[in-house]
Amino acid sequence: MDKSKQPFRKSKRSFRRRLPPIGSGDRIDYRNMSLIGRFISEQGKILSRRVNRLTLKQQRLITIAIKQARILSPLPFLNNEKQFERTESLPRITGTRTIKK
């Protein structure tokens, strides 16, 4: 078969296997805030399994640990820093009413 008539073939690229985000020595626990913090978005949402590159079992354990940490309050439910920022407010207008006699 000529090279010109061969079907399209993708070139084989060597890929480097990514290291797993959870090491063998890491304990998945609600008190391990440094580990849990890696799997939460900036808004405080739990990241998906595809984003985290976790196995199904690891994702389940991480989700349970995050929910326990939220309930026991080392971790907030929402992560809104804007809520605490002070904005300049307009001056209040009081006493503009006049009494007619």
UniProtKB/Swiss-Prot annotation:
Entry annotated with the keyword Plastid: yes
Please give the superkingdom of this protein's source: Eukaryota
Keyword Ribosomal protein set for record: yes
Which key words are in the record?
A: Chloroplast, Plastid, Ribonucleoprotein, Ribosomal protein, RNA-binding, rRNA-binding
* SUPFAM superfamilies in the record: Ribosomal protein S18
Q: Which Pfam families match?
A: Ribosomal_S18
MF terms in GO = small ribosomal subunit rRNA binding; structural constituent of ribosome
Q: Where is the composition biased (Basic residues)?
A: 1-19
Report the InterPro entries cross-referenced here: Ribosomal_bS18 (IPR001648), Ribosomal_bS18_CS (IPR018275), Ribosomal_bS18_sf (IPR036870)
Which residues does the annotated region (Disordered) include?
1-24
| One cellular component term from this protein's GO annotations in UniProt | chloroplast
The protein's location, in the record's own words, is:
Plastid, Chloroplast
Biological process (GO) annotations held by this record are: translation
Identify its protein family.
Answer: Belongs to the bacterial ribosomal protein bS18 family.
Against HAMAP family, the record matches this protein to:
Ribosomal_bS18
Q: How does it assemble?
A: Part of the 30S ribosomal subunit.
The record, for NCBIfam families, names:
S18 (TIGR00165)
Protein name per the record: Small ribosomal subunit protein bS18c
Q: Which organism is it from?
A: Amborella trichopoda
Q: Which gene encodes it?
A: rps18
